[in-house]
Curated annotation (Swiss-Prot):
Entry keyword annotation includes NAD: no
Role summary: Required for the expression of the capsid proteins. Performs the splicing and internal polyadenylation of the viral capsid-encoding mRNA precursor, which allows its maturation and expression. Transactivates the viral promoter.
Domain of life where this protein originates: Viruses
Pfam families named among the record's database cross-references: NP1-WLL
Composition bias type Basic residues, residue spans: 8-18, 27-40
Signal sequence extent: none
Region (Disordered): 1-89, 195-218
GO cellular component, one term: host cell nucleus
Compositionally biased region (Acidic residues): 196-205
Keywords, ordered alphabetically: Activator, Host nucleus, Transcription, Transcription regulation
Gene: NP1
Organism: Human bocavirus 3 (HBoV3)
Bias (Basic and acidic residues) ranges: 73-86
Protein name per the record: Non-structural protein NP-1
Length: 218
């Protein structure tokens, strides 16, 4: 065999390439990209699942925000000058007294229970506040001082409740009690359950009582 033919075969073999060399290249060939644009997470969760989860969280957040905003809106409506439909015995009795000047003096379960509640609120904003300021150190008080304040208010309220119970026990036929209790029962019978379910705050009760006392003095 001539040297020329040997060289030609060697060149052809190099152009064709070695089969083993091609097999070694195959594992390193890049894979074709998937047409889907949703990458697979390690846990098997796709981006669509992540979207659903984020959407649920966003929905819960919006619902929570709406629930929180309801009391705020209600407060703004009450302080914006609009008439508040909620009532308490003080307002009902004062309105009735204004239209019935011959009505008897205040008495009855609703009157006394509201009066004692007003006294407790008034004690917190006045007497107990002053006592706290006298006992506080860096705007703080210890347990002994707090216990003293609590027992002081308890003693006052206990006495008022005992007086009310004594009156109901020994004056069961009190005309004034029957009169004013019937007035408030008639009021409750003509109001909606939604209005009565709304709780009156201590500040509103105290403000109504002060207005009533001012009207009575005039």
């Amino acid at each position: 065999m001539s040297s020329g033919n040997t060289k030609d075969k060697h060149r052809a073999y190099k152009r064709k390439g070695s089969p083993g060399r091609d097999e070694r290249k195959r594992p390193w060939q890049p894979h074709h990209r998937s047409r889907s644009r949703s990458p697979i997470r390690r846990s098997g969760e796709t981006s669509s699942g992540s979207y659903r989860q984020e959407h649920q969280i966003s929905h819960l957040s919006s619902c929570t925000a709406s629930k929180i905003s309801d009391p705020v809106t209600k407060t703004k409506e009450n302080t914006s000058g609009k008439r508040d439909s909620r009532t308490n015995p003080y307002t009902v009795f004062s309105q009735h007294k204004a239209s019935h000047p011959d009505a008897p003096g205040w008495c009855g379960f609703y009157w006394h229970s509201t009066r004692i509640a007003r006294n407790g609120t008034n004690a917190i904003f006045n007497e107990m506040k002053q006592q706290f300021q006298q006992l506080q150190l860096d705007n703080k008080i210890g347990w002994d001082s707090a216990r003293e304040l609590l027992f002081s208010q308890k003693k006052s309220l206990d006495q008022q409740y005992r007086n009310m119970f004594w009156h109901f026990r020994n004056a069961s036929d009190c005309e004034r009690c029957n009169y004013w209790d019937n007035v408030y029962r008639m009021h409750l019978a003509h109001v909606s359950s939604q209005t009565e379910s709304e709780e009156i705050t201590d500040e509103e009760m105290l403000s109504a009582a002060e207005s009533m006392e001012t009207d009575a003095s005039n």
